[in-house]
C-alpha cells in the first residue's frame, strides 16, 4: 500500500512539474478582428529568455533552426524562438544589442529612412527588475544596466496609447506579416506574430486592446519568424539577425 501511494505521489509530482513547464512558455492562436495572430507569453521567473546573434565561432546563427541545432549540441532544447529586431545586410543588429550583459552594438540615435527610424523607436530589455519596453530617448537619458536588450522601431504603443508615428495611420493600406513584443508586467514578456498581413494600426490595437500592454515595440515585418513547437511553428524564411530564445 505504501509503495502504491509513493507511486501515486510521484506521478502527481511529475504531472505538476509538466504542467508548470508547459505554462512557462504558453503560446496560443486566436483571431483578432479578421486576422489570425499567434502570441507566446514567457513566464520570466520560470524561464530564462535570452538574446542570440552569433554562435561560438562568431558566425551569425542566421536561422532559428541553426540556433536550435547549436543549442542541441550543448544539451539544450529550444522551446521558443523569434527574430529580435532589425539588422544590416551582414545580419548585424541595426541598433542596440546586449547579450549576457555585454553590449555588442551601441544605441542607435541616428536619423534615417525605414521603420527602425520611425519616431518613437525603442528598446526591449531584461534587467534585475524584469522585462520592460522604453523609448530610445528614455534609455539614453537614464541608461539602465540590462543583461539583454534589443533596439527596434517604431514603438507600437506608448504609455497606454497607440503612438503618433506616421506609419500608425488608421487609414493605411500597407499590409504585412508583423511581429512585436511587450511586457505586461516585469515578470512576463509577450511576443506576437501575425499569421497573415495586417496594418501597423491593427497590429498596435492587438497589443493595446487584447493584451492590455501600455508599451509595445515593433520588431520587424515580412521576415518575421517564430519557433514554437507547441503550436506547430518552425518558420524558415530569410536569414535573420538577432533572435530571442528560450532553452531548457
Predicted regions and their residues:
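Short acidic-glycine loop/turn motifs at beta-strand connectors
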Residues: 43-46, 100, 125-130, 159-160, ...
Amino acid at each position: 500500500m505504501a509503495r502504491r501511494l509513493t507511486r501515486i505521489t510521484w506521478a502527481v509530482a511529475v504531472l505538476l512539474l509538466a504542467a508548470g513547464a508547459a505554462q512557462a512558455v504558453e503560446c496560443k492562436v486566436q483571431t483578432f478582428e479578421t486576422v489570425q495572430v499567434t502570441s507566446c507569453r514567457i513566464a520570466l521567473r520560470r524561464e530564462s529568455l535570452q538574446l542570440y546573434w552569433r554562435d561560438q565561432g562568431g558566425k551569425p546563427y542566421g536561422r532559428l533552426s541553426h540556433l536550435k541545432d547549436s543549442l542541441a549540441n550543448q544539451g539544450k532544447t529550444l522551446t521558443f524562438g523569434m527574430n529580435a529586431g532589425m539588422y544590416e545586410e551582414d545580419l548585424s543588429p541595426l541598433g542596440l544589442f546586449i547579450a549576457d550583459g555585454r553590449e555588442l552594438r551601441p544605441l542607435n540615435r541616428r536619423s534615417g529612412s525605414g521603420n527602425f527610424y520611425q519616431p518613437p523607436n525603442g528598446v526591449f530589455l531584461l534587467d534585475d527588475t524584469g522585462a520592460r519596453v522604453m523609448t530610445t530617448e528614455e534609455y539614453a537619458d537614464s541608461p539602465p544596466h540590462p543583461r539583454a536588450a534589443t533596439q527596434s522601431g517604431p514603438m507600437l504603443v506608448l504609455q497606454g496609447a497607440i503612438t503618433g508615428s506616421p506609419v500608425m495611420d488608421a487609414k493605411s493600406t500597407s499590409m504585412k506579416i508583423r511581429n512585436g513584443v511587450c511586457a505586461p508586467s516585469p515578470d512576463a514578456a509577450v511576443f506576437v506574430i501575425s499569421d497573415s498581413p495586417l496594418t501597423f494600426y491593427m497590429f498596435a490595437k492587438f497589443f493595446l486592446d487584447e493584451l492590455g500592454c501600455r508599451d509595445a515595440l515593433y520588431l520587424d515585418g515580412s521576415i518575421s519568424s517564430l519557433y514554437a513547437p507547441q503550436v506547430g511553428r518552425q518558420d524558415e524564411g530569410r536569414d535573420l539577425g538577432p533572435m530571442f530564445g528560450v532553452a531548457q
